A protein has these predicted regions:
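Active-site-proximal cap/lid insertion segments
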Residues: 1-214
Length: 214
């Protein structure tokens, strides 16, 4: 997708360098399924072993440090129905962390390719003359993966099929690859909506509706 976008930019600049151009670049990321090359997934091995509760705290602290949220902001409580990370078995932690590693890899890979597109604009000499609007999504992070996550979001979301931990462990190395249509646990979705509560499916809370824009 990025390569085609770059070719389009180069073609427009070659044919009519004085003419403005418009591009709508819309990746599937971070909508499920979360897919990424294996080497990108490997970069995040162990990065989420601390779990979703600690991840919320770390994200919240970083948001304050970067001025994304006011200094007096208070972190919302873990929403009802989301288990505390410290109460989970080792197998559950392993599976849940894997889903998040894959999600992070998919997001990073998308960002990398957006960077390639911006570099192409820069090479035309028009970067400072270009308006770039970056919208991160159309809703909050999604809870459709259920508590366990899933390797087949369509079966889970549309038909109510759930996958137990033993099955997910058997699919561990396939998660994020072409044989899966994976989605992470709704607890990770909640963590990704920090500092707000809830997720895409709960529009009464900002966790379901707020999105970043640059």
């Amino acid at each position: 997708m990025a390569t085609r976008a770059i070719n389009y930019i180069n073609k427009q600049n070659s044919l009519a360098p004085e003419k403005p151009f418009f591009m709508y670049y819309c990746t599937g990321t971070a909508h499920a399924p979360h897919h990424a090359p294996k080497d990108w997934i490997a970069k995040y091995k162990g990065k989420f072993d601390q779990g979703w509760d600690k991840q919320r705290e770390e994200t919240f602290a970083r948001q304050k440090a970067q001025g994304v949220i006011p200094e007096n902001t208070k972190l919302t409580q873990r929403s009802d129905g989301i288990p505390a990370w410290d109460t989970l078995s080792a197998d559950r932690k392993k599976v849940y962390a894997r889903f998040m590693e894959v999600y992070a890899a998919a997001l990073s890979y998308a960002d990398y390719n957006i960077g390639r597109v911006l570099e192409a604009v820069e090479k035309t000499g028009e970067l400072d003359n270009t308006i770039i609007i970056y919208i991160m999504g159309d809703n909050g992070a999604s809870a459709e993966g259920t508590v366990n996550g899933t390797t087949n979001e369509i079966a889970t979301a549309a038909n109510g099929v759930t996958e137990d931990i033993s099955y997910l462990l058997s699919q561990y190395d396939k998660i994020g690859g072409p044989e899966t249509y994976n989605h992470y646990s709704y607890a990770w979705a909640h963590a990704m909506n920090t500092p707000f509560q809830w997720t895409k499916q709960v529009a009464s809370h900002f966790g379901g509706t707020r999105n970043g824009m640059v």
